[in-house]
Regions:
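Glycine-rich phosphate/diphosphate-binding loop of Rossmann-like nucleotide-binding domains
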Residues: 90-135
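Long amphipathic alpha-helical segments
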Residues: 1-70
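Glycine-rich phosphate-binding loop
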Residues: 138-178
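Short glycine/serine/threonine-rich phosphate/pyrophosphate-binding segments
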Residues: 31-33, 104-109, 133-134, 155-165, ...
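Glycine-rich oxoanion-binding loops at beta->alpha junctions
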Residues: 79, 123-144, 189, 205
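Short, acidic/small-residue loops that bind anionic groups at enzyme active sites
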Residues: 70-74, 165-188, 204
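C-terminal binding/interaction regions
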Residues: 99, 140-143, 180, 184-228
Length: 228
């Protein structure tokens, strides 16, 4: 779908890959973003808007309040959901979301919002970092009862939680380094490096990449059935 000279929207992404259309707000002109969303809405299609700027979020909020577009704010405004006609069944299986600290929760909630937009089921354990190992083991036992097919584990600072978590659970673990931390190795750098050097099997995405982590989890859910 073409939107003037500014965009070519992939309307077959969900059917082809199992993941929703995601429109990145960051770097786009506000009017261009709105034009893209209007075109999607007119065609009855949904989308996720990730990382809107402050002015974009204000604009989207105004459109939502006026009921001009079927928009919903998720994850504290870090993600917006343009609701459209159903274009597929909810993915089978559960995604576990785990954070080391409360400061990592906003990135985890970005991921949860993307998963929520397509009806995926999630279970969460927040603020269960390795500074209190009793919290980690207790949370792992609780979430394992839901039999997640993949875990997204978010951690800043030293980034140790994904490695520990991967040693406790059966499902694959995706480490998501967050930009929590300061000084040398801060802003997620030490966390990213630690996860890349994990001795336990952990896949790793970029710093603060909650949305890509969620999309990867959806690929795992839709790429095979739970019985395969």
């Amino acid at each position: 779908m073409r939107v003037g000279r500014i965009a070519r929207i992939d309307t077959g992404r969900r059917a082809r890959t199992g993941v929703p259309e995601v429109v990145l707000g960051e770097g786009k002109d506000d009017e261009h973003l709105v034009a893209i969303l209007r075109a999607l809405a007119e065609d009855g299609r949904g989308a996720v808007v990730s990382r809107p700027t402050r002015s974009q979020a204000q604009r989207l909020g105004g459109l939502a309040r006026a009921a001009t577009l079927p928009l919903e704010s998720l994850a504290g405004g870090r993600v917006w959901w343009l609701r459209g006609m159903p274009d597929g069944d909810p993915p089978a299986g559960v995604v576990g979301l785990v954070t080391a600290g409360t400061a990592d929760v906003p990135i985890a909630e970005e991921a949860r919002a993307v998963l929520q937009s397509v009806g995926a089921t999630t279970v969460e354990a927040y603020d269960v970092g390795v500074a209190g190992l009793h919290r980690v083991t207790r949370a792992a036992r609780r979430l394992e009862r839901s039999h997640p097919r993949v875990y997204l584990v978010f951690a800043g600072r030293e980034g140790a939680l994904p490695t520990v978590w991967a040693g406790l659970v059966r499902a694959p673990v995706v480490g998501v380094p967050t930009s929590v931390g300061y000084g040398r190795g801060g802003r997620g750098e030490a966390a990213l490096n630690a996860m890349l050097q994990s001795c336990a099997p952990v896949a790793v995405v970029n710093i603060d990449a909650g949305v890509p982590a969620a999309l990867f989890a959806l690929h795992l859910l839709t790429g095979s059935s739970p019985d395969e």
